[in-house]
Each structure stands twice: as C-alpha cells, then as structure tokens.
Regions:
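Local sequence-structure signature of Cys/Sec-based thiol-disulfide redox active-site neighborhoods
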Residues: 1-26
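C-terminal alpha-helical interaction module
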Residues: 2, 43, 81-82
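Conserved beta-strand scaffold positions in the cores of enzyme catalytic domains, especially
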Residues: 28-30, 61
C-alpha cells in the first residue's frame, strides 16, 4: 500500500492527517506544496482536490482529512475513538 499525502505549510489538517497515519502505523510519502508540486499539478492529477491535505492510496484519490479518516476506519486501520 502506497499512501501519499499532499500538504502545505501551516495547515492544521495536514498535521492531523499525519497523526492519523501514524496511529494506523503505516508508512507514507509526504509531498509539500511549492516544493514537490504546484497547485496546478495537483489539480491536473486529482481534479476533485479542493483543499489540503489530499491523500491518495495506490494512486487512488481518497480526499481530504474527513475522507481519509473514514477510509482508515472502514479499513479497520484505526478505531473511531482515540
């Protein structure tokens, strides 16, 4: 499973998604806005992206923080309680 998160500096939800992935105990790749990609490149790859963070799993667009939480809970990788 390859998880990639697209983040931007100063983004609180980006910090939270990294905490979520750590709870799931899975490796991930972080790509940072204006260092690893531009907003235009992200939208070209994932037109449904509408903010940060954006998470993909094996190239499949999952979404932002809320969708990512749902993904991990549905897969049984984290519980809905901390």
């Amino acid at each position: 499973m390859e998880i990639i998160i697209y983040t931007m500096k100063g983004c609180g939800h980006c910090t939270r998604i990294k905490e979520l992935i750590h709870r799931a105990n899975v490796p991930y790749i972080e790509k940072k806005l204006d260092i690893d990609f531009t907003r235009e490149e992200l939208l070209e790859m994932y037109p449904k992206a509408n903010g940060y963070p954006v998470m993909t799993v094996d190239g499949e667009f999952i979404g932002s923080l809320v969708e990512s939480v749902k993904y991990f809970v549905e897969k049984g990788m984290v519980s809905s309680r901390k």
